[in-house]
A protein has these predicted regions:
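Extended, highly charged accessory segments
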Residues: 1-189
Length: 189
């Protein structure tokens, strides 16, 4: 049943868990397949990367806010390399990145070579190109009286507003909201 001998650790008493032999076999298979694809199991100290059909999956057990931070950094770097803005899916245990022309080695390099203190500055430059900024700008713009209440955020000419308000307290407030509500820059360092 446990063909990879993953669940036979002396520190793990599997009988403490309500799982039958069939379930145990399924669990072992799933873990084994993951290890074959990514070379290990992700933990809070070990990040693994899987190459799927059209995406790279970064298995990171860091939680949603840290993964959001890391995901936006990786997407910005991938988009810079490929010349196209990719797609990002964030979950508490993984980051999915769809961008053409990137490899797992690229992701490892960007994670290892980006100075932690540069993270906030990089995100401040790259986030204004993100989809999330549109919604936050609509929210903050209404509070500052820039955008009328009831305006559909999808109809905002975001690039024009970003150009107009770059370097002002308005755009800084938008970024601060994103950093505080969606990301954990300190934790990602």
């Amino acid at each position: 049943i446990d063909r990879f001998n993953l669940l036979s650790s002396s520190s793990l008493d599997i009988s403490d868990y309500p799982i039958n032999e069939h379930g145990l076999g399924m669990l072992s298979e799933e873990i084994g397949e993951h290890m074959e694809k990514s070379g290990g199991l992700p933990t809070d100290r070990n990040i693994t990367i899987e190459a799927r059909n059209d995406a790279l999956i970064v298995n990171s057990c860091q939680g949603t806010k840290i993964n959001e931070t890391l995901g936006h950094l990786l997407l910005a770097m991938a988009s810079t390399k490929s010349g196209n803005w990719g797609r990002l899916i964030i979950e508490s245990t993984r980051i999915g990145i769809q961008a053409s022309g990137i490899s797992p080695e690229d992701l490892v390099g960007w994670l290892n070579e980006t100075p932690p203190d540069a993270l906030e500055g990089l995100l401040s430059v790259t986030l204004p190109n993100s989809r999330q900024l549109r919604w936050r700008f609509a929210e903050v713009g209404k509070a500052f009286g820039i955008i009328r209440h009831g305006v559909d955020p999808r109809r905002i000419n975001l690039q024009a507003l970003i150009r107009k308000y770059r370097g002002t307290v308005v755009l800084q407030e938008v970024l601060d909201k994103l950093f505080f509500e969606k990301m954990d820059i300190q934790g990602a360092k």
